[in-house]
């Protein structure tokens, strides 16, 4: 059977051989950063911006990947080209770059990093129905990271608190998406997405101090500006989510996903709301593909 190709430590290899040793610090200590993009009809979206964020994360955690950002970009594009014959009509890929500190015992051991790139088909069926009904967002007990311990702007795989938050949310509703608070009780983010609310025609989202600075978040602001819809970052509390007219999540693979309920409380008259719809349509026009229709075609 023909399988997808991955990249690991200088080699393009079958995906089934893309493995790291159990002594790798990425596995043992979560000492690894990553980034992720998606394709639209095979064309990758904003790769350079994602790689720039990856390199900021690498600089912050003091891991030298051993290659330039231009080289990382070229390898990513080559990997996509090698896997394009397996993509299939109507499908698209998630693209994932990761860099761990390698197989050292301590963080300062002089060992080479582990550098990898993978592609995998987007699981449209896992979320497509929420374009019609709106997702259910649940605020769990587990809180998000504090910048005093690990800055949320770093995109990393040390995600045990996110796993606990997801379990707490799915205890309430097996299909729920967790929305974490920060240590001060402000809304922060979902485990893989930024959260937005719409109240009185104004789009608001948690400010940059307690969240990952999402590329998709930036896209939402750009589209809102183009559509003439006011949008801003702000400190938000659960009250703001409960009383919003609309809400949505924004991330790499689903772009914009309407939210219909927060902690079982319905939002507005119907999800998706009118501004959420306008943004999703504008994003579809931006990438030349009907994002909602593509996802719905897989259910």
Protein language model features and the residues they cover:
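Secondary-structure junction motif
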Residues: 216-217
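Glycine- and Gly-Pro-enriched alpha-helical subdomains that act as flexible
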Residues: 178, 186-208, 213
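Conserved alpha/beta cores of soluble small-molecule-handling proteins
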Residues: 1-179, 183, 212, 221-299
